[in-house]
């Protein structure tokens, strides 16, 4: 008879849970409509929008808020959340990466090359408020 090696005790996998950061804006967010697009915004983060009016350092308010979510729950607008405002600070005006468009007709010696760089505004989300009170 051959001996079978004894199986080592199956150890439990290490109980490591990914702890979400306990910062104030960890689970707060708002979905807003700006520049014909919808953006998911969280406090104290920066985002790039199509060029917005305003100088560097100016404050901008977005009132087209589609959804707001915080510790108290979510509020969905129809189409916009009443009295909800997202306050932004303009950090910089920049240009996006260059996009090359190349059109060609084969056998015709027709070629056209065009480049484009989108004008962007980098903003920092300062606060999300509903009814004049900060989201919590």
Curated annotation (Swiss-Prot):
This protein binds to 23S rRNA in the presence of protein L20. GO terms for biological process: translation. This is Large ribosomal subunit protein bL21. PANTHER family: 50S RIBOSOMAL PROTEIN L21, LARGE RIBOSOMAL SUBUNIT PROTEIN BL21M. InterPro entries: bL21-like, bL21-like_sf, Ribosomal_bL21, Ribosomal_bL21_CS. Keywords: Ribonucleoprotein, Ribosomal protein, RNA-binding, rRNA-binding. It comes from Synechococcus sp. (strain RCC307). Part of the 50S ribosomal subunit. Contacts protein L20. Belongs to the bacterial ribosomal protein bL21 family. One of its GO terms (molecular function) is structural constituent of ribosome. Residues 1-21 have a biased composition (Low complexity). It comes from the Bacteria. GO terms for cellular component: cytoplasm; ribonucleoprotein complex; ribosome. Residues 1-25 are annotated as: Disordered.
């Amino acid at each position: 008879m051959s001996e079978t090696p004894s199986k080592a005790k199956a150890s439990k996998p290490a109980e490591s849970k990914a702890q979400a950061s306990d910062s104030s804006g960890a689970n707060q967010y708002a979905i807003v409509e700006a520049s014909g697009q919808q953006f998911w915004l969280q406090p104290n983060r920066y985002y790039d929008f199509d060029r917005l009016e305003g100088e560097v350092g100016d404050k901008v308010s977005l009132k087209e808020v589609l959804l707001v979510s915080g510790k108290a729950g979510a509020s969905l607008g129809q189409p916009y959340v009443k009295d909800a405002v997202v306050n932004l600070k303009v950090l910089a005006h920049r240009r996006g990466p260059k996009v090359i468009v190349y059109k060609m007709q084969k056998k015709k010696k027709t070629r056209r090359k065009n480049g484009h760089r989108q004008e962007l505004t980098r903003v920092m989300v300062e606060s999300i408020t509903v009814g004049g009170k900060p989201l919590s």
